[in-house]
């Protein structure tokens, strides 16, 4: 074992674990590209102030922050949304709205490492900028559901949803500053409700927030929404608009077959959310595996014009934890080509065959192991290969190859001109 190990909270990925991560990211890319989103790359190292302005209390405490050789305070990005907003402000404001962007990349947070929580991890996310419509909210949340459907997880996941605009309205009426609001939401997010309620001197506010936090239902129930409206009306709050948004979005999502859970006590740790918020939960893990929300003030905070926006980020490694097995029909086929004699002609034919395989999106590997054929068969079965191709003296003389299909336990001798058709038909 090497004396050098990955830094605590970070890890190496290879084999099946890496295959799951790549499967998630490739599936994500396919779905979002088909939905009209364009990819953006941003640096891992950014100006510290980009994140310290509005990323939220918890994230600011867990950032990797340091000074570079020019004495600038910089940070490893703890999330990617602020970077996307920076790109938009610098280079994309002139483009037609709404603007649909996506990203895939590593982020860093100095959390205490535990199952499902790493200090370096990957996020795949989208941002839709320039629309305040509830249609945009529905597009983004249903897109998230579609991604998990494509990953084979739709039947297991539930999307938890709330409208943080309800809390913002109450806090604004109570005269609570934005900075105080961020702290209160952080306390509620961490389950420290009693500490949050201590910030209020008016018992009416305490009673209403206590009621909201307790309200949750697994599907859209009109009687519970009516109960919410009646309760809110007692306190003379104008929350009808925010409640109606939550009701409309939930109703359409249910019509689309999205499994949702409305939870009025659910808030997210990012300080910039202003409207609908959501996260993906899975019964096999105790933490969310994806989440997002509406952030209509962030562009203005960074110096731009008012630009409504909504987005989400998928925790790639967290999602990988709940994928038991990559769909077999989405895994690429693998074939090993084994020259049985060491001649120029056998090697030339092997390389030509490998090129045919790769052209057809089949993984082709030249055998370099000098062991008996029986051991090779066992090895390639254990490694998950679908077939092996034998090229010996007889095959060269007859201008053919021998294919052993390992799953079907079938063997075929095929003329060279028929190789492509036989492989495609038997491996599809």
From Swiss-Prot:
Coiled coil, from the record: none
EC number(s) recorded for this UniProt protein: 6.1.1.21
Any one Gene Ontology molecular-function term assigned to this protein's record: histidine-tRNA ligase activity
Group of enzyme by EC: ligase
Keyword terms: Aminoacyl-tRNA synthetase, ATP-binding, Cytoplasm, Ligase, Nucleotide-binding, Protein biosynthesis
Subcellular location: Cytoplasm
NCBIfam families assigned: hisS (TIGR00442)
Protein name according to UniProt: Histidine--tRNA ligase
